[in-house]
Amino acid sequence: MHILLANDDGYLAPGLAVLHAALAPLGRITVIAPEQNHSGASNSLTLQRPLSVYEAREGVQKGFRFVNGTPTDCVHIALTGLLEDKPDLVVSGINQGQNMGEDVLYSGTVAAAIEGYLLGIPSVAFSQVDKGWEHLDAAARVARTVVERIIGTPPAEPFLLNVNIPNLPFEHIRGYRATRLGKRHPSQPVITQVNPRGDTNYWIGPAGDARDASEGTDFHATAQGYVSLTPLQLDLTHRGQLDALDQWLK
């Protein structure tokens, strides 16, 4: 089993190191991650300049390769030229903070898994609910459990999974739930600041609170102490509007 690891928090992030340690007994692990934090990068590719790949020489990251680009860059170049043999599985994470509801449209963590899926490799994104790295050991144990299940009982079709893990001690996690994406309220307003030169600067505001956290959603499952596993698809066609649009065009 050959597993490619990526993330969006950068190759020095604790979530990547513990994920690597947790999955190492399961097979050969290749790490190719961004040099810097690229949270919110979504599926962006770097097209205006060449990319470089480096290798960490010390610490727990020794042997990790990192790229001066986005999470999608990392997986793309890994699967389209950098690696001589393609991995059996792409795993992204463990992200610092949840990726639920509309978060999946912005998340670099989910984007890395999407790129693997687009290039024909089963892919999983792992995120830990709430900021901070509390109970990261528990999140790593959950990730290993999910990957072991994938290895032992592979799904019948190529898959793209989004996994969100409650920020709890392992013994307090109640189990696993198959979920759908919930929905958020719109994001909070931008935060404005005036710098010493008198220029106005803008910071993107916090994400909106959950609007649909009903039973069956990722928001509901994690709030109840369950690990949320959401199968994703990439077809954004609104099929319910096709007939109406066709009539509108006539």
From Swiss-Prot:
List keywords of the entry alphabetically.
Cytoplasm, Hydrolase, Metal-binding, Nucleotide-binding
- Per its record, how is this protein called by name? 5'-nucleotidase SurE
Family listed: Belongs to the SurE nucleotidase family.
- What PANTHER family does the entry give? 5'-NUCLEOTIDASE SURE, 5'_3'-NUCLEOTIDASE SURE
Q: Give the protein's function.
A: Nucleotidase that shows phosphatase activity on nucleoside 5'-monophosphates.
Please name the GO terms that the record assigns under molecular function: 3'-nucleotidase activity; 5'-nucleotidase activity; exopolyphosphatase activity; metal ion binding; nucleotide binding
EC number(s) per entry: 3.1.3.5
Recite the UniProt cofactor note for this protein: Binds 1 divalent metal cation per subunit.
Residues recorded as binding a divalent metal cation, renumbered to this chain, are D8, D9, S39, N95
Kindly give the InterPro entries that the UniProt entry links to this protein.
SurE, SurE-like_Pase/nucleotidase, SurE-like_sf
Disulfide linkage: none
Q: Pull one GO CC term from this UniProt entry.
A: cytoplasm
